[in-house]
Amino acid sequence: MGKEYDVIVIGSGPAGYVSAIRSAQLGLTTACVEKWVDEKRNSILGGTCLNVGCIPSKALLDSSQKFLEAQESLHMHGIKMSELAIDLPMMMSRKDNVVKQLTQGIKGLFAANKVDSIVGIGRISAKNEVSVLGENGKNEKYQAKNIIVATGSVPIDIPPV
């Protein structure tokens, strides 16, 4: 049997990590369960939006917008460039750094607010109980007075009419 908490949050996306941090700030013992892991088997916090969705796409859009501005409007300011090129590996590196900085920020907030991060797939297994399937294939059960489900969603295919 794992540790007992006042609050366990399943999912560390925008709703999950904010819920976990706020719960801890209110003095509740808090854990957050996340299934995404890095190559060192540490939790990757932030969910789809931060890691592969909204934030990375906006970082790349920002770089693309800068390129377009340089291409189309800098000459109006008396700035002339002989050669303008996109360095895609550099753009991707910048995007990765933006994501890393934000995920590290969440990790720092978890540490500062004493939120435990649990790696695995969480599910409610009984009243006030969360079962976490770890990468080792073992289930560990945690007790919680309150459980917040913040797992996000996945789209479904709508069958043709």
Where are these regions (language model features)?
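Short glycine/serine/threonine-rich phosphate/pyrophosphate-binding segments
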Residues: A15-R22
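Beta1/beta-strand and adjacent pyrophosphate-binding region of the FAD-binding site
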Residues: M1-A15
